């Protein structure tokens, strides 16, 4: 299920990628073996070629202003998605990425995933954890609860809970996910591709969630690599989010009753 806004423009990316797929926590150790290889990139704007249908559902990628009791710092909450809030994935359990600004105190945040069909909204999962923010986090969808179907539209949202008794004032951002079925040609190309080539393919095909997660994986493995940092800056600039490109990256770790951001 893909909604086209305009013809695609070419994208050329060459990067040293040391992870095979996009599941960040599972693949991080493999990336650490060679993530420091040189990389060069040329990223062109084209991610907005896909947009969700008019369902009436929200689509905010930046927290923005609020009259709630939320601290002013919370308004910088940002979903790392294209301007249309729409991104594609080939994964049944993709990783979403968002920036959580530094908060004045530890606060509760919530992450939910909803299946959307016409005017029907079916909740699939909800997670909550405590954080003081201050980083860009890579947050995988829970495999045990959330397996995305091809052709089904999904919406995820992430909120900073400012008043547990009245969540209408929460700072909320979110994005759309469209899981696509790759063609046999694309599948074969990825199966035979080196990690470097796989990232190039994701980007060439404008598969946002997989491309962004792959690059985030590299940066997590080599946070001091200046070339990877520049590639990350270019990627975020291509969707108008260059202002948060220098924030440190973190993954998510979880226990049955608690979740937290771990650098």
Show where each model-derived region lies.
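Bacterial N-terminal signal peptides
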Residues: 12-23
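Extended, polar beta-sheet/loop recognition surfaces of beta-rich domains
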Residues: 37-56, 68, 86, 130, ...
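Contiguous beta-strand segments within globular domains
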Residues: 75, 83-104
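Extracytoplasmic/surface-exposed domains of secreted proteins
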Residues: 96-98, 136-176
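Solvent-exposed loop/turn segments flanking beta-strands in beta-repeat/beta-sandwich domains
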Residues: 102-111, 117
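Solvent-exposed serine/threonine-rich low-complexity stretches and specific carbohydrate-binding patches
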Residues: 122-135
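Inward-facing hydrophobic residues that define packing positions of alpha-helical scaffold repeats
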Residues: 214-216
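Preference for solvent-exposed, low-hydrophobicity sequence contexts
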Residues: 218, 223, 229-263
